[in-house]
């Protein structure tokens, strides 16, 4: 029973935080530390590591479901020009993904081995929280240059992708880094969030394939119970992410990202306190 409860809770946390600029990794670690969720035979160390990445696909399916028409170049409801624009958008997404793909392959293991600790996570939560507040204060009197996602240039997509590389540091938040970068480069908040969602599709698919593939190539395997627990987390993450994305996009139509900045600072301080107390272990 606790195996399923743990899967549901982590799925909820993943779905809520994957696309908000607040660090899903940090929140999953916090959830496990604060609630001391017990796990049975299912939750081996190797399975837990794979599970945390696999359920991200549920959140990605939420993006695909919500933006299927916009991202589908084969839609019969689109004109030939609109289909062409969709293909161009996908090429921009690929351009934006390339920096994270290259640096991720080179640095991923190093980051996990040396930077996945309470001090780094708390520091990045706080630093980027401050950055959101500072950038929003700077941007409040500056009109965005890019107000439609199709108007993002290839150069801009590449630079947003370079910001995404920052999210390799635990606690940064992939969506946080890309949204912040896009806003700095002149995108509206709405466009910044949308493009961040689109970038997540190839990135998360790639990371999940890399992690699960590595696990299987090393001789790992899943029991029936583990596959069922993973399926539960996947579905919960999918459903909750649908809700989180809709709420966030409605919110930023008339509000800025400063609330997320303040929230990150509070969570970062909490993370630091728990780390000092020895309650957060990685």
Curated annotation (Swiss-Prot):
GO biological process: cell wall organization; peptidoglycan biosynthetic process; regulation of cell shape; response to antibiotic
Top-rank EC class of the record's enzyme: hydrolase
Membrane topology listed for this record: Multi-pass membrane protein
Entry keyword annotation includes Cell membrane: yes
Function: Catalyzes the dephosphorylation of undecaprenyl diphosphate (UPP). Confers resistance to bacitracin.
Other remarks on this protein: Bacitracin is thought to be involved in the inhibition of peptidoglycan synthesis by sequestering undecaprenyl diphosphate, thereby reducing the pool of lipid carrier available.
Name under which the protein is recorded: Undecaprenyl-diphosphatase
Species assigned in the record: Leuconostoc citreum (strain KM20)
Lineage per the UniProt record: Bacteria, Bacillati, Bacillota, Bacilli, Lactobacillales
């Amino acid at each position: 029973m606790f195996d399923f409860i743990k899967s549901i809770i982590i799925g909820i946390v993943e779905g809520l935080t994957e696309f908000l600029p607040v660090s899903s990794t940090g929140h999953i670690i916090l959830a496990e530390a604060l609630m001391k969720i017990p796990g049975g035979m299912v939750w081996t160390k190797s399975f837990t590591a794979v599970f945390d990445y696999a359920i991200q696909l549920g959140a990605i399916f939420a993006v695909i479901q919500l933006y299927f028409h916009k991202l589908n170049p084969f839609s019969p409801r689109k004109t030939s020009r609109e289909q062409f624009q969709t293909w161009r958008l996908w090429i921009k997404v690929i351009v934006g993904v390339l920096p994270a793909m290259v640096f991720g392959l080179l640095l991923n293991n190093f980051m996990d081995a040396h930077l996945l600790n309470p001090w780094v996570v708390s520091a990045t939560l706080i630093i980027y929280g401050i950055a959101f507040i500072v950038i929003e204060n700077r941007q409040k009197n500056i009109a965005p240059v890019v107000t439609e996602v199709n108007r993002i240039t290839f150069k801009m997509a590449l630079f947003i992708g370079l910001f995404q590389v920052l999210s390799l540091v635990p606690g940064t938040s992939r969506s946080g880094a890309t949204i912040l970068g896009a806003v700095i480069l002149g995108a509206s908040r709405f466009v910044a969030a949308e493009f961040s969602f689109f970038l997540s599709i190839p990135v998360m698919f790639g990371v999940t394939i890399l992690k699960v593939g590595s696990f299987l190539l090393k001789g790992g395997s899943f029991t029936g119970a583990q596959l069922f627990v993973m399926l539960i987390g996947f579905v919960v993450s999918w459903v909750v992410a649908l809700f989180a994305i809709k709420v966030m996009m409605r919110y930023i139509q008339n509000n800025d990202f400063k609330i997320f900045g303040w929230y990150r600072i509070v969570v970062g301080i909490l993370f630091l306190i728990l780390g000092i107390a020895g309650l957060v272990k990685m």
